[in-house]
Amino acid sequence: MALKLYPLGIQTFERIRKENKLYIDKTEYVYRLTHTSGTYFFLGRPRRFGKSLFLTTLQSYFEGKKDLFNGLAIEKLEKEWTEYPVLHFDLSGGKHMNKEQLERYLAFILETEEKKWGITQPQIDANNRLTELINTAYEKSGKQVVVLIDEYDAPMLDVVHEQEQLDTLRNIMRNFFSPLKYSEAKLRFVFLTGITKFSQISIFSELNNITNISMNDDYAGICGITKEELLMQMSEDIEELARRRNITKEQVIDKLKENYDGYHFTRFSPDIFNPYSLLSCFTENEFGSYWFTSGTPTYLINMMRKYQVVPTDVITRVEADASEFDAPTENMPTIMPLLYQSGYITIKEYHEDYNYYVLDVPNKEVKMGLTKALIPSYVTQNTLATTNTARRIAQALDKQNMEEALTLLQTFLGTVPYCNNAHYEGHYQQMLFVIFSLLTDYQVDVEVHTPNGRVDIVLLTHTDLFLLEIKLDKSAKSAMQQINQKNYHKRFALSGKPITKVGINFDSKTGNIENWIIEKA
């Protein structure tokens, strides 16, 4: 049992404070955001990352509920505590809907706010109803209105791969948001959250002064949990988890970091832990997979198919300009913006001199989740059999026995149904990449450059370095000849580990390994 009451599944700041559950203090960001120039703000973060909680924190702040903030950072910062009328719209319930269903849903959430303000005979169209709500709240309170919109993109995410349906739903949402522009004089503060970044032209047609704080260093830690917050507010829980797992406190911190840390959303961001996985780990006292298994969105899988994503496109470090990943998702040339904004890849490095970023999967949990999600497309529908085989291969490699590892792989592939891509050499490279990526403690790279060419696969274990060259319908001998003729192994001479060369030949008729040759460098 956890030492503290964790707010898993609770996204309401007021409830968390009243029920004395753990709250990671983000109120300094509330003060900073509400005391800066500008009226319209947008924050993009992955699902289950604390966006809704921050939104309800803003709501309690603007409603003047000072008592809820006792002992928090903002208590010493804020002097006025002015109360404003707040309109809060949660669009997360608008998923998987067609045109008529979405229009009814908007009518429903508008009606909830209309009842609060005594509007009994509302307008018909959503934009006119929102305009009337803003006008009524402004006139009855005598103060400017605060509008908070959570998960603004939820109605559109599931159809982002279907252009016609996307255009239809996007027009509905653009119409709904339109009063936010021409009601500016009556608005104190407008804040929208979401996962993805849609272009202002497509959604906020005239709202050209919205400030996107998603990659602003001043708000790097606005969602998620930093290492400093972890150590300061969860120290007792770390010790309890160490006791239960019979490991040291330092080992617990290392495992938490390996599994759930590694997110960066700005150039100079501190390491950010996934809050959902971190709190779930403390609740369950297990280093499990929580965020990924809580629901891989169907839109992501659909888009990966649409863009014909191969595993190495996802589970490999990549250099990119900000415009290549912090970009609108509706017309993206690659899947990178969606992977980044959804939290499946993140910023790992920023090189200021040349203004470019290095992106990669954030941590072990996400890497394993993505790898398993790709198994059906590149190995077999039987994910369990694949992961079990990968585990046995890892045990063989831990014994420095590549012969046994390849025998296990050959036996396993003999049970896998024939694949339509079996006549492409690249298919086998991707298949091996997926299987080896399941060996979580190892590093696997493909198409690694050397002075004389590129190695198909480089596998780095705790003790050894393996160079794999793949051939299709040729021979393992020709694969080994290529390794030796091009001296691939010399590129890795300073690795400090024994190097093993592996030539593998696949048979396109069976989709399996025909033979292999193993040599020490």
Regions found by a protein language model. Give the residues of each.
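Phosphate-binding site recognition
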Residues: 1-424, 439-440
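Active-site metal-binding core of divalent-cation-utilizing nuclease and nuclease-like domains
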Residues: 136-141, 435-463
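Structural motif
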Residues: 146, 464-468, 500
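Mg2+/Mn2+-dependent nuclease catalytic core
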Residues: 166-171, 472-489
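Metal-dependent nuclease catalytic cores in nucleic-acid-processing enzymes
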Residues: 176-183, 337-345, 433-437, 482-502
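Conserved catalytic cores of phosphodiester-cleaving nucleases, focusing on short active-site segments
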Residues: 432, 455-472, 486
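Domain-level recognition of nuclease-like catalytic cores that cleave nucleotide substrates
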Residues: 491, 495-521
